[in-house]
Amino acid sequence: MKIINILFCLFLLMLNGCNSNDTNNSQTKSRQKRDLTQKEATQEKPKSKEELLREKLNDNQKTHLDWLKEALGNDGEFNKFLGYDESKIKSALDHIKSELDSCTGDKVENKNTFKQVVQEALKGGIDGFENTASSTCKNS
């Protein structure tokens, strides 16, 4: 009888050990799932307005967006610019390209003057930008 009791106790201990191992496995799996979801959440950072806009621009427009960012200097002004309608931004960047393309040869120093003109023109908003922001390169 004692042997049966001892064997029965050993059987229960083994059975209990198997159940606790299953619990550890399920806890480990749930931890792995939780870790994966946390990694995915950190990887999916929302894109900035600038990044979203850059995806929709061609290479020339991206180049002139960089030029404009440098010209505005102030992040607040640039962020205000990014808040405008996409089509207006694209037309403004195309206008900047055409004006800068005319500043070649002897007129290269006029590019810096054009930066100041652009800064002042954008203070009044993007509407009418093409009329108010013109370089002196075409006039000379």
UniProtKB/Swiss-Prot annotation:
Lipid-conjugated positions (N-palmitoyl cysteine): C18
InterPro entries given in the database record: Mlp
Lipidation (S-diacylglycerol cysteine): C18
Induction section of the entry: Weakly induced when grown at 35 degrees Celsius.
Membrane topology (UniProt): Lipid-anchor
Keywords, alphabetical: Cell outer membrane, Lipoprotein, Membrane, Palmitate, Plasmid, Signal
Family: Belongs to the Multicopy lipoprotein (Mlp) family.
Pfam name, any one: Mlp
Entry keyword Signal: yes
Any single Gene Ontology cellular-component annotation: cell outer membrane
Organism name: Borreliella burgdorferi (strain ATCC 35210 / DSM 4680 / CIP 102532 / B31) (Borrelia burgdorferi)
Domain of life: Bacteria
Protein name: Lipoprotein MlpD
Region (Disordered): 22-53
Region forming the signal peptide: 1-17
